[in-house]
């Protein structure tokens, strides 16, 4: 299993519109992606947000993660994406 770790900044003035885009556009697309296992979007603090999305393979994670998938939401800027193999789960 592999994780896509996404760092982003959120414009607080556009947070409600960003949350709506997440729920109505991004989540459905990610859930239906090949190899999707689970996803977690953490509430932003001081304009900084994170998501952790798990896939069966690294290739599937790379094909779905931004900017390849064109994740777009008002007031959101993707500041970085890393891919890691999941070492353990509990």
Regions found by a protein language model. Give the residues of each.
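Short S/T/G/P-rich N-terminal loop/turn motif that feeds into the first structured element of a domain
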Residues: 1-49, 56-67, 76-90
């Amino acid at each position: 299993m592999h994780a896509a770790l996404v760092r982003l900044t959120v414009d607080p003035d556009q947070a409600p519109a960003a949350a709506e885009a997440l729920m109505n556009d991004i989540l459905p697309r990610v859930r239906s992606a090949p190899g999707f296992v689970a996803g977690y979007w953490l509430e932003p603090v001081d304009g900084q947000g994170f998501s952790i999305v798990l896939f069966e393979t690294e290739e599937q994670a790379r094909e779905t993660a931004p900017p390849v998938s064109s994740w777009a939401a008002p007031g959101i800027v993707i500041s970085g994406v890393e891919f890691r193999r999941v070492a353990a789960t509990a």
